[in-house]
Amino acid sequence: MLKKIQWVSSHEFEVKINALIDEICNKEEDKIALFVEREVLDDETVYSFNTEKPQRAFGNAFPPILSTIDKKIEIGSEGILNNIITRFQRLDSRKYYNYPSAEIMRSKRINKVIILTDTIGSGNQLNKYLNCFWNTPSIKSWLSSGHINVYVVCFAATEFGLSRVELNKTKPSVFYSRICPTIDNSFTNQERKKYMKSATNIIL
């Protein structure tokens, strides 16, 4: 089982993520909003919005959760991904916008929203994050009218997670470097039964 584990260096991780972003942002006129996926509350939205109709989003986007706020928390892939989007914005600040405000989304005519994450497992957390966009009235309107499209960039994903995320209401296009090795796709039926039996014996 240990032989099936795949080691990924931070350098390889960054190179692959950068390449996938470049693949999406292939038009000179593209205006890109960049976000890094994180845990969210059930009722969280990207922007505040007017409760009375017409509901209109306003103000700053919800913030990233930075590990540097609490030094007890180790900086992992989330820190790397935030560094990546910072570099893209510095590379071309007229094309890339990190966590843009609702006003910038309108004035700059953002047409692509890219959400970065390290891996897609079950797809639960990413789906909740995507729902924050769908539950923000102005963004929902832009998505429905085709003014913006959502893209998800990750290093690896399970086939199950991909199938769930692709059914999200935001209709995201998912770009990934590789499929995650799982017990189902890495072993034969006989091998799976053997490992499951061993695991059961250990638990007992």
Q: Which role does the model predict for each range below?
A:
Residues 115-116:
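Generic enzyme active-site microenvironment
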Residues 120-121, 152:
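A short glycine-/small-residue-rich loop at the edge of a beta-strand within enzyme catalytic domains
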Residues 60-111, 121-127:
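Short, glycine/charge-rich flexible loops or terminal/linker lids adjacent to PRPP-binding catalytic cores
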Residues 1-79, 84, 131-204:
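PRPP-dependent phosphoribosyltransferase catalytic core
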